[in-house]
Amino acid sequence: MTLYRLHEADLEIPDAWQDQSINIFKLPASGPAREASFVISRDASQGDAPFADYVARQLENAEKQLPGFKLHKRWDINIHGHAAVLLDYQWQREGRDLMLRQVFIERRPAVLITTLTTTPADLPHHEPAWKQAMQTLVPRPTPS
């Protein structure tokens, strides 16, 4: 059994279970900007592939699947000793432009992903809160 820690509780789960949990936070409207979302998810699909290949595959899938996809930024970064990649891109849903800022953090057995979803015009209004949250993100060691 493995200890699993939630914000509200701790529990033990069988070792064979795979964590696919998602944490969703709503950012309040800020000035003229509408609400945004900040999501933390886990993805075990990296497998044995190099992290760069995993990120390239994720980017390729987004490009194929998201209408009006446009990549704005791709930065290789390091978060407390973990390889990470920041992607800023936009796409269209129901005729509306959406802006995503994703950070992929290598942490086996699952990549940790943070996603800020807003609009291109609203990003500057939500960016300070996003930066503040991300500066406090410290990946925990992988349980043995």
Swiss-Prot record:
One Pfam match: DcrB
Subunit: Homodimer. Two dimers interact with Tse6; this interaction is crucial for Tse6 loading onto VgrG1a.
Function: Plays an essential role in toxin Tse6 delivery to target cells and specifically in the loading of Tse6 onto VgrG1a.
Protein name (record): Effector EagT6
Organism of provenance: Pseudomonas aeruginosa (strain ATCC 15692 / DSM 22644 / CIP 104116 / JCM 14847 / LMG 12228 / 1C / PRS 101 / PAO1)
Organism placement in taxonomy: Bacteria, Pseudomonadati, Pseudomonadota, Gammaproteobacteria, Pseudomonadales
